[in-house]
């Protein structure tokens, strides 16, 4: 496995302008450029040779392993025109024209979603050139009229005076407009690298019409870089940097490449603008897809970044990826939706973007149309559905990883002006490493759970209804799904034991135990003397002894991690939590309900002891955590957890909870209206918690992440009575099933 890690690390350290496959279509346009010295020969004869040497058996050019009619015909026609322009390769041209004649009618049958970028602009222009060259194809094909109509619609959306004076996506397809535009104006929109919006074909056309030296330099560099051919777009540096980081994270292997990922994101951050970014640095045109991916990754890694960039893509009540686009791309809206998931409080633009993107994606799902115009991937519908059904505030990392390992493919194909591949984004090495890592962690987790089972069997907890073996498995799953790294084995065990104990105690006092018993348990925790338990019930004695044993054990381990005794701090954690349980019990028995503010301030989630105890075992040295119970991040976690639990309760009419209190304070509301208000309050608290987690502060990041993980766990499994049904399949996928 470590050889795979080093191979990936070498890839990451070699990132530059992007690894991308070559394009026959764009190479054909470069091959058409006449020599700038005035001689009757091509400026790039090596590109002409590449065309003659790379025709496929059926007479077309393109991706050998994937046939799409639009792509193959467009490339075949471009190559045939290039060869005919220089009166060479007659047999190759003849074979290409045979392919075009045979295949052109099939364009009517192909899904227009798979039409290459700018096809409706460049293909009609090439048809006109083919007619001028008297190439033998059927110019009366009905499908051509449809394409001409699409071209007209596109040009109506972006008028020619705009194309010639302002950066738009049509700069990427100027070869389709070369007879009508003013090249003296358009060349002023040239990118710093000499290209026209990083398109080799568009730049080659500009070079033909202007002889611009920077265009020539750009193409010379590309032909040399790609060994006599060119890609459909270059550079793709920001795109590659971002999508690699995204894939590594979703595959669960990013922890091996912390420094390399930081370098990649530092690079992207240098080119971030207040209008967003595109696929390449210094682009005069921004797009919502790359901007969304950059925003989400940068923000989640702690970079200071404003969501105001999304105003660039807001048009009235909707959002677009590009101004003047023909239609929405599923992946663009998918990434916009994902970006909205890292929203901080008050960020209205992200709220609007997320709402729009979700509505669009839900509509596509209902229509069974979750496929995209930019990528042909293994399971895009599954990716989108998982994101819609599992929003970030209710998603556990390892479950998402397990799902994505099944969805990731090493051979995804992207749709640009032609089909292309990104070998550093999609490759078998990533997948092999992800599978090996997941199976390694899963095997370790299984051993840890067996250790927990032995502890459970040796304890007296099984006599209580609330301490079931299935619940033990569920609490361990919550740890394995969030703090899964091999080196955090003690943290997982401590988390599992603490949450298991607190859930069991909570259930006991909800259904069986008396207020006096709870007071006795708290008194015993204060005395902390297993040999002097006082006059209390047998059940309280057992609960205290089991709690005493695990805290003592955790204290011994904690000394090794912290270099000092943490026993007092661990006892205080349990005293605080039990006291909050007592307060809630007293409120339930009282005729006077607390205010919502009082109720939430006093609420301490059943998961709090697990979070605060585990903090000592995640590799960070903590000076003190005495004030953590009153800290903002702890309060936010508890509040968010309590609110989400209350919104899923089955006892809205009788129990003391956020909804009944909210109704009491707002009697004009219906029950459903109060529920909606409390759900909105829960969402706002999750936003606050995310903000607090990502801000720099005295508490180490690894510790803050525990609080966020805990709130997400409570969002995934709100209410102990619903845990079993919802968890069983998740537990199986993460703990029991190896990845094959």
Curated annotation (Swiss-Prot):
Per the record, the pathway is: Secondary metabolite biosynthesis; terpenoid biosynthesis
* BP terms from Gene Ontology: diterpenoid biosynthetic process
Q: Where does substrate bind?
A: 154, 373
List its EC numbers: 5.5.1.12
Q: Where is this motif: DXDD motif?
A: 287-290
Q: Which Pfam family would be a valid example here?
A: Terpene_synth
Q: What family is this protein classified in?
A: Belongs to the terpene synthase family.
| Primary role | Monofunctional diterpene synthase converting geranylgeranyl diphosphate to copalyl diphosphate.
User: Which PANTHER family does the record associate with it?
Assistant: ENT-COPALYL DIPHOSPHATE SYNTHASE, CHLOROPLASTIC
- State the name under which the record lists this protein: Copalyl diphosphate synthase 2
Classification of source organism: Eukaryota, Viridiplantae, Streptophyta, Embryophyta, Tracheophyta
